[in-house]
Regions:
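Sec-dependent N-terminal signal peptides of Gram-positive bacterial secreted proteins and lipoproteins
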Residues: 2-24
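Bacterial lipoprotein signal-peptidase II cleavage site
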Residues: 18-31, 45
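Extracellular mucin-like PTS domains
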Residues: 31-77
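Short, glycine-/small- and polar/acidic-enriched structural segments
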Residues: 66, 74-219, 236, 242, ...
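Short, solvent-exposed loop/beta-turn-alpha elements that line the ligand-binding surface or hinge
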Residues: 105-113, 263-276, 342-351
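Pocket-lining segment of extracytoplasmic ligand-binding domains
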Residues: 143-144, 225-321
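Secondary-structure end/capping motifs
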Residues: 290-364
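Conserved C-terminal helix/tail region of periplasmic/extracytoplasmic solute-binding proteins
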Residues: 355-382
């Protein structure tokens, strides 16, 4: 219980961008979709690697024997064995990247996995589910993954990066052409004490601007307050995430995207030996689940990558699925998807980018990553 309470408290220091990107500032209720187990026989290669020794033995026997009725029955039992996987994601880009997999899973098991998906409005809905073992895999803010790892003694591992930076500087007008143009300006922003603040401070400092003295940052509690401030300030400048930028532009035709903070971060990292990246979200797994069901985890990664690739290559169709699962409307999703930086990065590249990113946050505020940088076992490398 103490662990769970400390984790929930740590959420105050973790970014809620993933939920905020849902277009309503985290005020909508969680949408849940449950995929029921299919009773039909699945003949995928992943299913044939079923975890039970008894089932594996039956499958091997069936493959070796002639096609008698008993042998066929044994083969069907082995092939039909499924692993139940509970997945949670937040309204926003990380959930957007899953929609093709979610849609496929409604028809039955995918790659030997029987999925239950839950879309949550905020990260504080996800954390207790992971801690209590009710969720096996979850899409969470990148720094929250580190907080979870540190506060559960390594009971969470990161599988992949699924969202790069979604933060943008927007303005009424065209006075901001580079980061240096922000000097002396007022910036409306939300997310103080979490990733947006640390990312903005890093980019400003890297361009010779002191965040404490050279700019004025007016921190708001929600993205919607930033939009309201822009509407009443004809020279207003704000830091907003996608797809909230797209929603704001629909309300204010004069609003212009001035800077992509992901690109500005990359520019500062260009000469680094192992460049990091501005990250928004990752997908994590309970360590115990990964150890017990490695085939299921790897099958999920394969299916999730296919889903991300589909979403990025089929924007219109993906937008319809995004609306189907009540993440954002299809109209907003179709315009925002090209700027949401939905991706799939695993393995050593994931470790390099994420570890560098966490180090930047740690140097500003150790509590933002759970008090310490994660050890190598934090990174799931298959």
């Amino acid at each position: 219980m103490k662990k769970a309470l400390s984790l929930i408290a740590a959420l105050a220091l973790s970014v809620s961008l993933l939920a905020g990107c849902g277009g309503n500032g985290g005020t909508e209720t969680a949408a849940e979709t449950t995929v029921t187990e299919s009773t039909s026989v699945q003949e995928s290669a992943s299913a044939e690697n079923a975890e039970s020794e008894e089932v594996s033995s039956a499958a091997e026997t069936a493959a070796a024997e002639t096609a008698s009725e008993e042998t066929q029955s044994q083969t069907e039992t082995a092939a039909g064995e499924e692993t139940a996987v509970n997945v949670m994601a937040l309204k926003g880009p990380t959930a957007m990247g899953m929609v093709q997999l979610m849609d496929s899973a409604e028809a039955g098991p995918v790659g030997g996995n029987s999925y239950t998906f839950t879309i949550a409005a905020s990260a504080d809905e996800v954390t207790p589910k992971l801690v209590q073992g009710d969720a096996d895999i979850a899409a969470v803010p990148a720094n929250l993954a580190s907080v979870l790892y540190n506060n559960t003694d390594g009971q969470v591992q990161v599988l992949a990066i699924n969202t790069l930076g979604v933060l943008y500087i927007v303005e009424n007008g065209d006075s901001i052409q580079s980061v240096s143009d922000l000097a002396g300006k007022t910036i409306y922003a939300s997310g103080k004490g979490s990733t947006p603040e640390y990312a903005l401070n890093y980019i400003l400092s890297g361009n010779g601007i002191d965040p404490e003295t050279d700019v004025t940052i007016e921190w708001k509690s929600e993205h919607s307050e930033c939009v309201a401030a822009l509407a009443s300030d004809e020279d207003g400048i704000a830091m907003l995430p996608q797809p909230f930028v797209t929603t704001a532009q629909a309300q204010n035709e004069n609003l212009r995207v001035a800077l992509d903070l992901t690109k500005e971060w990359d520019a500062l990292q260009a000469d680094a030996e192992t460049p990091s990246a501005l990250l928004t979200g990752v997908v994590v797994v309970r360590t115990a689940f990964a150890e017990e069901h490695p085939e299921a985890v790897n099958a999920f990664l394969d299916s999730y990558k296919e889903s991300v690739d589909y979403v990025n290559a089929n924007v219109t169709d993906a937008a319809a699925l995004i609306e189907k699962y009540d993440i954002v409307t299809a109209a907003v999703a179709e315009k925002a998807l090209p700027y949401c930086n939905i991706t799939f990065i695993e393995g050593t590249e994931m470790q390099e980018k994420l570890s560098g990113y966490l180090n930047v946050l740690y140097e500003q505020n150790p509590a933002s990553v759970g008090g310490a940088l994660p050890a190598d076992d934090f990174y799931y490398i298959r």
